[in-house]
């Protein structure tokens, strides 16, 4: 990280370095309404995942978890008194929801929107010692379309400032121009002397990119702020350019929960998610459908992940309950959201909403009015980034709504890309939500029925086939051919239309990871989490991972076979085999016998052998690229599980331990699941368990869980060797 020292640039000689920012994570006490005893908790905290699942079907779209209720938090503290003339600021990055903040008996803040970050000047409410901070949070039924989490689910921080300091969220660092030879950076901020603006030059700058996320430090009044130097250009005719280089964003949509940890934000878990995505070739996320944790954007800055920063899931018309607060709060919430995030180099686009109910009205005037207002608010705070929204309706492409934003956000509309750009040459286009392919890791159903998709009308036929053939007992087939809604489609379709339309800024797949709630189309069949993820809820890759890796990292040798090869009772029956590879030729072998060598055709993103008959033994694929051997993959029929294999990967304070059921040769056994129980030694804490089964209602915080197709994840704090499977 490079440092630009600008100490004293505003008032040299008056600088005072004070305590800076402190995260209040320990020392909290908590109780739910109806309880009489406070108990210790660590913040961020999510009470909804602490007590296990509600009865199946209680609230499947919120994961059958007890998120509804009212919670009370209390923390006593001394200190944080600023020097003479200084100020102390308290920031609550997210409280789910309808919060009230009380300091020493005085109400100092609160927000109805659970995802809103609130910074409060608490100087006048502080005592020299004996301070008591109280936070109330209340979730009501039907307030969210997915699992929202409960309580103080993001960081609480205190910032102590000298008299001269940068006022909260007033700093705006932006790149005016940048080449490899030089850059000019503009800085503005508010302080007690008013608003200050200045520019400075950087010679031979290291430009921020996903591949090389170089960061600099700006020092003002003794405090350090990070920024990156980069130029993002969005041209409706030519596409997206980062530092002068054309690229299409290879993005995914991300809900805010962290799987078995619920909604309580954890940097190490988020870092793992981003690492897995980047290893696949992903370079962008969309924060669907709400402002993210501020710490997530810090990670994206560090790791090189571009962000479409999204504000709302609804406007005036309801989908949850924020519409009840819209008139009073939307201007303030949107303004402060943009002010908080605008200096992050990772943020490249703003989204003012997703699939708004206003788009369903025949008369578009309400949608046009609101979108125009919101775009104006964003532009008044940050005029450097394009504004978009997400629409799964095609009418807003033509009825005037498209003119309210810089780039139209198309949800599941790849067949409209070319026409839109032709009819709207001055408006950009981005795939804000694509595919919605659903699958359960390791599940495959037969027969495999998938009619071709060559036009929009084919999607209805494919959906009807899928509903009949690809859904069974709360699980979805893993052939990656189907989605539950009318406009959904497999990854291959989006790849083709992105390739055909380089003016499109990129895509954001629905979704990167399975998330708690929205178990479409299995809500009535016992589903608890979604089926949309490229990764399951535990972070294990589904088969789709390899089709994205092959497309997004074409220079990395990749080959992957599906399905697994354990089909006792199907001997001699047709069992189609698909291969995802970055090679351009592939040959499949069953027990050494070739099933044919195939060449990749135009806009072909998978190889298929649809007439293979199941014979136990070995599946092997060999691939080539430009005539040279490229990558291989093997699937073998497994025997009975004889041991539990173990592998682990550490991120910060947490170790993610994978337990695999394997046979005597070490082959994964996806067909013989069993329950694993765990004990711990002193110095080891079992944080959570997850098997990735979207229909499982087992307790994430328990000490036992059933494997799902041979795999189980344990998240451990402390010495991982102290986790002992029984």
State where each predicted segment sits.
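Short glycine/proline/serine/threonine-rich loop/turn segments at secondary-structure transition edges
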Residues: 83-86, 126-130, 144, 201-215, ...
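Extended substrate-binding grooves/exosites of carbohydrate-active enzymes
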Residues: 43-46, 50-56, 106, 155, ...
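Beta-strand-rich structural segments
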Residues: 187-190, 219, 577-580, 622, ...
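Accessory carbohydrate-binding/adhesion or oligomerization-edge regions at the termini
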Residues: 16-59, 132-136, 158, 492-495, ...
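Short S/T/G/P-enriched beta-strand
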Residues: 234, 550-576, 635-656, 662-665, ...
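Accessory beta-strand-rich segments of carbohydrate-active enzymes
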Residues: 31-33, 63, 68-168, 291, ...
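An acidic-aromatic loop/edge-strand motif
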Residues: 24, 45-63, 112-114, 122-193, ...
